[in-house]
UniProtKB/Swiss-Prot annotation:
Single GO biological process annotation from the record: DNA replication
Protein name as annotated: Replication initiation control protein YabA
GO cellular component, one term: nucleoid
Function in brief: Involved in control of chromosome replication initiation. Inhibits the cooperative binding of DnaA to the oriC region, thus negatively regulating initiation of chromosome replication. Inhibits the ability of DnaA-ATP to form a helix on DNA; does not disassemble preformed DnaA-DNA helices. Decreases the residence time of DnaA on the chromosome at its binding sites (oriC, replication forks and promoter-binding sites). Tethers DnaA to the replication machinery via the DNA polymerase beta sliding clamp subunit (dnaN).
Coiled-coil regions, chain positions: none
Residues annotated to bind Zn(2+): 95, 97, 109, 112
Cofactor(s) this protein cannot do without: Zn(2+)
Native organism: Bacillus velezensis (strain DSM 23117 / BGSC 10A6 / LMG 26770 / FZB42) (Bacillus amyloliquefaciens subsp. plantarum)
Cofactor: how and how many bound: Binds 1 zinc ion per subunit.
Zinc listed as a keyword: yes
Subunit annotation: Homotetramer. Interacts with both DnaA and DnaN, acting as a bridge between these two proteins.
Family affiliation: Belongs to the YabA family.
C-alpha cells in the first residue's frame, strides 16, 4: 500500500466517522424530543385520570342523590296518604289521637289537633 492509498483510506475513514457523528447527533436529538414528548404525555395522562376520577365521583354522587330523592319522595307520598286518611277521619268526627282513637268526637280535641299540626 503506498502513501496515496493510505492517505485516501484515512480520508475515507474520516468521512465515515463524520457521518457517524452526524447520525449520532441526530439520534441524540430525536431521543431528547421523544423524552420530552413522553414527559408531556405522562402529565396529560395524569390530568386526564384526575378529571376522570372527579367526573366519576360526581356521577356517583349525582346517582346517590337521585336515589335518595326518589326514596324521600316515596316516603313523603306514603306519609301524605296516611296523614290525609287521618285528617279525613278527624273531619268525619272521630278521634285520631292515641288517647281516644276511633271514638266519636264531640268538639275539637287538643291531642288530635296537635297530631295534625305536627306534619
Amino acid at each position: 500500500m503506498d502513501k496515496k492509498e493510505l492517505f485516501d483510506t484515512v480520508i475515507n475513514l474520516e468521512e465515515q466517522i463524520g457521518s457517524l457523528y452526524r447520525q449520532l447527533g441526530d439520534l441524540k436529538q430525536h431521543i431528547g424530543e421523544m423524552i420530552e414528548e413522553n414527559h408531556h404525555l405522562q402529565l396529560e395522562n395524569k390530568h386526564l385520570r384526575k378529571r376522570l376520577d372527579d367526573t366519576t365521583e360526581q356521577i356517583e354522587k349525582f346517582k346517590a342523590d337521585q336515589k335518595e330523592t326518589k326514596t324521600q319522595k316515596a316516603e313523603q307520598s306514603d306519609i301524605g296518604e296516611g296523614y290525609d286518611n287521618l285528617a279525613r277521619l278527624y273531619q268525619e268526627g272521630f278521634h285520631i289521637c292515641n288517647v281516644h282513637y276511633g271514638s266519636v268526637r264531640k268538639g275539637d280535641c287538643l291531642f288530635c289537633l296537635s297530631f295534625l299540626n305536627k306534619k
